[in-house]
Amino acid sequence: MADLGCGTGELTLMLTQAGYDMIGIDQSEEMLCVVRDKAEQLGLSGRLLLLRQDLLKLDLYGTIRAAVSTFDTFNHIPDLDTAIANAGFFMEKGGVFLFDMNTPYKHQNVLGENEFTFEEEDASCVWRNHYNAADRKVEITVDIDYHETGEHFHEEFCEYTYDLDTIRATLKKHGFALESVCDGETFGP
């Protein structure tokens, strides 16, 4: 099973512990280093494969029976068609692809032009959003200040908006059947 855009590997490692043969894929070497460290601490180093790859240039050197992709990974990809095509190319017939995405509603109405501030004992975070309707994307800026060390973290990234009809058509085009769509809060239809 492949974890496409595995980030820090939380799901990858949980699935490895559950007995799945896992491939964690991320384009960030920093994220993969975190996964390696966690895997070593858990005694899982030899039980998973980590690959540094861009999902738009995915090459697995073989097939997989399942793939997962969480934390809105596919919203971060500007070319949904190529990313889905790549996942489909390496998927065995009858394979399963489980993923989550933010909806146009969330991008336009929840994130939109809003700013969120989070204050914790050890850090504060300011999350700013700008919805670009013409390009159908949210431009996001995150600033985190760590109180004890005085360190400052700044990141800018985009999430692209894909409507359900586009997602459904893209999946079908690349050999997938959309079995169900669930609400991210209730997990209902």
Give the predicted meaning of each segment.
Residues 5-9:
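Class I SAM-dependent methyltransferase "Motif I" SAM/SAH-binding loop
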Residues 12-57:
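Class I SAM-dependent methyltransferase SAM/SAH-binding core
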Residues 59-66:
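A short acidic, Gly/Pro-enriched loop at the edge of an enzyme's catalytic core
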Residues 69-70:
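A short beta-strand submotif of the Rossmann-like class I SAM-dependent methyltransferase core
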Residues 75-76:
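A short His-aromatic
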Residues 81-93:
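A short glycine-rich, Lys/Arg-flanked "PGG" loop and its adjoining helix->strand segment in the class I
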Residues 98-170:
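SAM-dependent methyltransferase
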Residues 164-189:
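C-terminal lobe and adjacent flexible extensions of AdoMet/dcAdoMet transferase-like proteins
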